[in-house]
Every structure is written in C-alpha cells, then in structure tokens.
C-alpha cells in the first residue's frame, strides 16, 4: 500500500510542499526567513485574535480597552507585547528576506517576486492600520499625517481623504474601519503567501551560487525541516527576550498618552520599520513629489528584475556588485536613523543625499557595475 501522505488529496499537497520537496543541497541560513515569516504571521494572527476579543474600536474606549487588556486580562500584557514586538520581528525577517532576494538574484523568478512585493505592501498597510488602533497620540497623529498624504493626488485627493476618514477628520469612523481592515488583511496575506509558495514550487528554490541545482537536490524533510526549526527557536528566543525584558524598546512613549486632536506631538514619526520610507518622503520639499518618492521607494523592487544586466544571477562571484549592495544596506540604515530625527540641519541634507543615493544605486550604479563585471570576465 502506498504511503497515505502521497495519496490523500490534502496530505499530498503538504507532502509535495514540505516533505518530499526537492531542495538545493547548498541553501544557507538566508533561506530560513520564508518559514520564519510564516511563523511570524501565525503568531500575529493568534495574538491578534485574542486581543480582538477584548479590544473595542471606539474612540472613547479604545485606549482604555488596551489598558484593560494589559492590567486585567490574564496574560493580556504578554499577548499585547507579543503582538507589538511580533510586528517588529516580522519586518526584520521581511527586510532580510528581501535583501537575500536582491543579493542572490531570486528576483529572476518574476511571479514569485511580484507576489512578494504585493505581500510587502499588504504587510505594511496592515502594520500601519494596527498602529492606529491603541488610539494614543502617535496613533492619531500618524494616521492623520499619513492619510493626509493622499490629498496630494491631483483633482480627487481631498475627496479621497475624506472618503477614507469617513468624515472631515480622523475619528470614530476611521478607527472602526481600520480595525475591520486590520482584522481581515492578515488572512489575505496568508492566502497571498500560499500563492507565493505555489509560484516558488513551480521553479524550485534559487541557491547561493545562482546556478541550476537540478543535478544536486535533497528532500526538504528532514534536512530543511530541522534547519527551519532551529531558525524558529532563535526567532522565539529573540522575540521573548524583547517582550519580557524591554517590551517598549521599539515603541514610542507618546503612544502612552491618549489621542488628543488639540495637542500635536513635537515629533510625529511612524514605527521604526517605516522610518526609511518616511525619511525619503520628508527629503522632498514638494508634497506630491514626496508621496511619489515614498511609493517608488517600495515599488522600485518590482523594477529590479528588469535592471539585471549581469550574466551571472547571484552576487556571490561579483565583488563590485557586493560592495554596492552593502552600501545600499548602509544607506537604508542611514535613512532609518534620519527618519527618526527632527527636521533640522544637518539631518535634512543627510536625508536628501541618502534618498538620492538610494535611487541612484538601484537604478543606475548597480546595472552599470554589472555590465562592467561582464566585461572583466570577457563575457
């Protein structure tokens, strides 16, 4: 009798995705982040579900309901901080996952890559709406500032903003709809992640060398299941350390003050994982230009596959491209730092230079360097 896992309609899907899947024998720990993102999503959905049981999406009671969760619900503080810091871990894994894709040329799998870019947008939208829900000062003003950016769209801008707000300012209607979207989006993300995997398994995984690995495959289980479990344990270790020792390390103290439309905080800034995009937005003095640059800072990822001029897929054997890649990483860290600083000298000019360098590296310097490397190898 054939093994049940290979014949049962449901189990054979699991079998071909996680057990008997042929995987390259040389994929490094940089390939762990896909499974870690799956674990992050599960943690977020579960903790979010339990938070939603006690949260009320009303401007009068939202802040106090979060306080109630932390003070009165059994382990409510743990669930709340797991959810808040789980989002940070989610984005750390996301950035490393995207960075891996850029470094090793995984973007050459176009469908997988484009679904990934879509997933990134969906996760960013979900995180933004989630940040509004506790209804603290930074929640309210962050929502006001970011939604207001849409008013820069010609002709329909102001109507669009009022339509999203459900009124003439960020108020009860806005909070209620943000809660509804924040609840449904993670399930859409889970479905998209399934499509992401579907497309990936059409081609098989890339590997550090960027070469075809068909001649040397190993079964996913037990080799990569064990490797993924190690990654998950490390993720949980870091997350629990953060939650139990310094849960507010990555948060904003302003969010412990209830939202007050009459009092603007001195420095309005989003969560740390949006700071790089926020810095790019602020570095352009024109409102519409800033909004376009903000959108393009993420959308540029969709253009990357068409800018691949190298005859090699991976950067493993391309030292000049490697150098530019790490300059890009340093540039993004600089932008993240600038996004959290006040708008004054010298931060303004540093932010503008870092923003120019970001687009210059991806659109111009990397493709030219790849062509140069082709010539060095007489290709």
UniProtKB/Swiss-Prot annotation:
Listed cofactors: heme b
Binding annotation for heme b b566: 97, 196
Keyword Transferase: no
Any Gene Ontology CC annotation: mitochondrial inner membrane
Pfam family of the protein (one): Cytochrome_B
Entry membrane topology: Multi-pass membrane protein
Gene Ontology terms: biological process: mitochondrial electron transport, ubiquinol to cytochrome c
Primary location class: mitochondrion
Keywords: Electron transport, Heme, Iron, Membrane, Metal-binding, Mitochondrion, Mitochondrion inner membrane, Respiratory chain, Transmembrane, Transmembrane helix, Transport, Ubiquinone
Regions crossing the membrane: 33-53, 77-98, 113-133, 178-198, 226-246, 288-308, 320-340, 347-367
Subcellular location: Mitochondrion inner membrane
UniProt cofactor note: Binds 2 heme b groups non-covalently.
GO MF entries: metal ion binding; ubiquinol-cytochrome-c reductase activity
CDD domains membership: cytochrome_b_C, Cytochrome_b_N
InterPro entries per the UniProt record, alphabetical: Cyt_b/b6_C, Cyt_b/b6_C_sf, Cyt_b/b6_N, Cytb/b6-like_sf, Cytochrome_b, Cytochrome_b_C_euk/bac, Cytochrome_b_N_euk/bac, Di-haem_cyt_TM
Binding site for a ubiquinone: 201
Binding site for heme b b562: 83, 182
Highest taxon listed in the record's lineage: Eukaryota
Family as reported in the entry's similarity comment: Belongs to the cytochrome b family.
Function: Component of the ubiquinol-cytochrome c reductase complex (complex III or cytochrome b-c1 complex) that is part of the mitochondrial respiratory chain. The b-c1 complex mediates electron transfer from ubiquinol to cytochrome c. Contributes to the generation of a proton gradient across the mitochondrial membrane that is then used for ATP synthesis.
Oligomer and partners: The cytochrome bc1 complex contains 11 subunits: 3 respiratory subunits (MT-CYB, CYC1 and UQCRFS1), 2 core proteins (UQCRC1 and UQCRC2) and 6 low-molecular weight proteins (UQCRH/QCR6, UQCRB/QCR7, UQCRQ/QCR8, UQCR10/QCR9, UQCR11/QCR10 and a cleavage product of UQCRFS1). This cytochrome bc1 complex then forms a dimer.
Remaining remarks: Heme 1 (or BL or b562) is low-potential and absorbs at about 562 nm, and heme 2 (or BH or b566) is high-potential and absorbs at about 566 nm.
Entry protein name: Cytochrome b
Gene: MT-CYB
């Amino acid at each position: 009798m054939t093994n049940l896992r290979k014949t049962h309609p449901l189990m054979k899907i699991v079998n071909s995705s996680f057990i008997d899947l042929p995987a390259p024998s040389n994929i490094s720990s940089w390939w762990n982040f896909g499974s870690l993102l799956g674990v992050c999503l599960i943690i977020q959905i579960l903790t979010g579900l339990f938070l939603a049981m006690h949260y009320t999406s009303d401007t009068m009671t939202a802040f106090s309901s979060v306080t109630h969760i932390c003070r009165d619900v059994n382990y409510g503080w743990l669930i709340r901080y797991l959810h808040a810091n789980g989002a940070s871990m989610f984005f750390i894994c996301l950035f490393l996952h995207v960075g891996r894709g850029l470094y090793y040329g995984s973007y050459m799998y176009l469908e997988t890559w484009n679904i990934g870019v879509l997933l990134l947008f969906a996760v960013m939208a979900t995180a933004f709406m989630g940040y509004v829900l506790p209804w603290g000062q930074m929640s309210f003003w962050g929502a006001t500032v970011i939604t207001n950016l849409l008013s820069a769209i010609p002709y329909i801008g102001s109507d669009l903003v009022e339509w999203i707000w459900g009124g003439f300012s960020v108020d009860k209607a806005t909070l209620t709809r943000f809660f509804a979207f924040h609840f449904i989006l993670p399930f859409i993300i889970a479905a998209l992640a399934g499509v992401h995997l579907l497309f990936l398994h059409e081609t098989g995984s890339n590997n550090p060398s960027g070469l075809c690995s068909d001649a040397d495959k190993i079964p996913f289980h037990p080799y990569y299941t064990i490797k993924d479990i190690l990654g998950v344990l490390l993720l949980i270790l870091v997350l629990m350390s953060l939650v139990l020792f310094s849960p507010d390390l990555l948060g904003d103290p302003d969010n412990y003050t209830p939202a007050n439309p009459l009092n603007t905080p001195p420095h309005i800034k989003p969560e740390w994982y949006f700071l790089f995009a926020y810095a790019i937005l602020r570095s352009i003095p024109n409102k519409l230009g800033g909004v376009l640059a903000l959108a393009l800072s993420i959308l540029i990822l969709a253009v990357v596959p068409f800018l691949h001029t190298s005859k090699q897929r991976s950067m493993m054997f391309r030292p000049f491209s490697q150098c530019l890649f790490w300059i890009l990483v340093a540039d993004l860290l600089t932008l993240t730092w600038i996004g959290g600083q006040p708008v004054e000298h010298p931060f303004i000019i540093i932010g503008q230079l870092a923003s120019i360098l970001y687009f210059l590296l991806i659109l111009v310097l990397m493709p030219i360097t790849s062509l140069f490397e082709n010539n060095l190898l007489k290709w």
